[in-house]
Each structure stands twice: as C-alpha cells, then as structure tokens.
C-alpha cells in the first residue's frame, strides 16, 4: 500500500496539468512510476484506503486470457468494465468496423491470442509463452503484447497496460508489465490486481514458483474531477495490512483457464478496508 499512496501523493504534489483530448478533461500528471508486488509471499496489492472490488479485475483479465472481444462475454465472467467503451464511446460507435452492440473489436486478448500476420494467419502469443515456460525455457522473448498500432482502428480502445514480459530464473518466474497510461484513482487498483494475479496464475499452470511482479507506468494521472476525493479523503486514511489471494490449486493448465475457471476459483483472505469512494470514470 505504501508505494501506491506514495505515487498518489507524488501526483498531487508534483504533477502537472495536461489536457486530454479523448475525454475533454485535464489530468494532473507525472511521468514514470515503478511498482513492485511480492507474489512469492502472497502480498496481494488490494487497495485498503477505500473498499476495492477485486473480482471484476480478475474477471476482466481472465477474459483477456480467453481472447474475448465482446462486452457480453466479460459480463458473463462477472465484470461490466467493457460496457462503456463498447457501447458509449462516441468514436467507436461511429467506427465502420464496429459489429454491433457489445462489440469491442480487436483489443487486448484478441491480440494476445490471435495476432494477425501479413498472410492472414494468426499467432497465439500466450500459448507460446506457456509452452516454453512449462519446459523451463526462457528465450528472453517471453513477451505478450496487446499493442498493435496496425489495428488500432479495429478496436474501441488502445491498450493501457499493453505488454507483459516473463523471466525465468532457475525455477522462479518473474513478470514485468508495462503500462502507457494509468487513471490512478480508478484504474491502478485494477491493474495492480491483474499484474499480481497474472504472475500467480502463470507460475501455477507452468509448474514454477512465483517471484516478483514489476509494474512500470509511463503516464500516471489523476483526472481533475477526481483530485478532491483523492487529496481530501483517500490520502487522509491510514492503510490496513495487505490481504492474501487464494487460487484453486486444481487450475493446472491454460486449457483450464480457457474453459471451466470462474470467479468461484479465487478468494481473498484477510481484507480490511475503509469505506468506498465513488470516483468519476472518464470514457
């Protein structure tokens, strides 16, 4: 929690105002933030200075793992996080590539599981990584990326947390995740959970020990309509100890994640928090 709160304080005290064309709002912004999560000791980075809803974050990333491209599929997993971008985003609604209600286009998991080659064939990036790590192979290119500029016009949103690099040292697996932009009051809670859980899951299904997850953010910001709540409410609260994440040990393969796994297979233990804070969300 300390590193999260330190980043929030840094933005409030050192940030500069930057206009955001997509949302029409101004953001208090800092460049470059590095966070680290201790997955080995199960220090689950769930925000405690406001009530945080972890299930939607894991459900969303499970949808990425499955390569989903429709908000309805994400809702079925237990998260509504793509409803607005799929159905309210004005630019996407006017995009001729949009295929109707709930369509997200070629975003996130679609790129991770079916990256298009010039000849029309696709590459399953995640499958390659899982296969290599299971065999104890780290070719120093165990990289999953959702960032495909050639297909930005085919999706409702460019990826924010866009690239994940796995590193195997002995039998310990580490993860470095890269994020181009982060709405700190709302998005970072989600992203922290996802980085931590992704490493925990990948270690489990490849038979490796989980090590540390490193989270690198380029543009970390607080929107103008979020600042007062962050400065005058959340940063005034004392954090509680971090909880732990329990994952069903029967999850042993990528196929398990693709088929039968639900949110019932995850449990957070020992979570204490302050009252919720309703931060505005910018589409």
UniProtKB/Swiss-Prot annotation:
Gene: thyA
Binding locations of dUMP: 22, 180-183, 191, 221-223
EC number(s) on file: 2.1.1.45
Group of enzyme by EC: transferase
Protein name: Thymidylate synthase
Protein species of origin: Haemophilus influenzae (strain 86-028NP)
Subcellular location: Cytoplasm
One Pfam family it belongs to: Thymidylat_synt
GO molecular function, one term: thymidylate synthase activity
Cystine bridges: none
Residues that hold (6R)-5,10-methylene-5,6,7,8-tetrahydrofolate according to the record: 183, 282
Entries under SUPFAM superfamilies matching the protein: Thymidylate synthase/dCMP hydroxymethylase (SSF55831)
Recorded family membership: Belongs to the thymidylate synthase family. Bacterial-type ThyA subfamily.
NCBIfam families, alphabetized: PRK01827.1-4, thym_sym
């Amino acid at each position: 929690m300390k590193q999260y709160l330190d980043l929030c304080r840094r933005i409030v005290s050192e940030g500069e105002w930057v206009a955001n064309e997509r949302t029409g709002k101004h953001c208090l912004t800092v460049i470059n933030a590095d966070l680290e999560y201790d997955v080995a000791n199960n220090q689950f980075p769930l925000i405690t200075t406001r009530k945080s809803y972890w299930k939607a974050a894991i459900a969303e990333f499970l949808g990425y793992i499955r390569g989903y491209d429709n908000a309805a599929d994400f809702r079925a997993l237990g998260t509504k996080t793509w409803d607005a971008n799929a159905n309210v985003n004005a630019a996407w609604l006017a995009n001729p590539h949009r295929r109707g209600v709930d369509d997200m286009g070629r975003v996130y998991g679609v790129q991770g599981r079916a990256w298009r080659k010039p000849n029309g064939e696709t590459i399953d990036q995640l499958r390659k990584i899982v296969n290599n790590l299971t065999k104890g192979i780290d070719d120093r290119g165990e990289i999953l990326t959702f960032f495909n500029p050639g297909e930005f016009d085919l999706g409702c949103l460019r990826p924010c947390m866009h690239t994940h690099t796995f590193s195997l040292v002995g039998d310990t697996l580490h993860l470095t995740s890269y994020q181009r932009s982060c709405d700190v009051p709302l998005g970072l809670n989600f992203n922290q959970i996802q980085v931590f859980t992704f490493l925990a899951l990948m270690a489990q299904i490849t038979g490796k020990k989980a090590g540390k997850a490193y989270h690198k953010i380029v543009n970390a910001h607080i929107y103008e309509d979020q600042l007062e709540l962050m400065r005058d409410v959340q940063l005034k609260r004392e954090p509680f100890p971090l909880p732990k994440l329990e994952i069903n040990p029967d999850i042993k393969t990528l196929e398990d994640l693709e088929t039968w796994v639900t949110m019932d297979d995850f449990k957070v233990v020992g979570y204490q928090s302050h009252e919720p804070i309703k931060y505005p969300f910018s589409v």
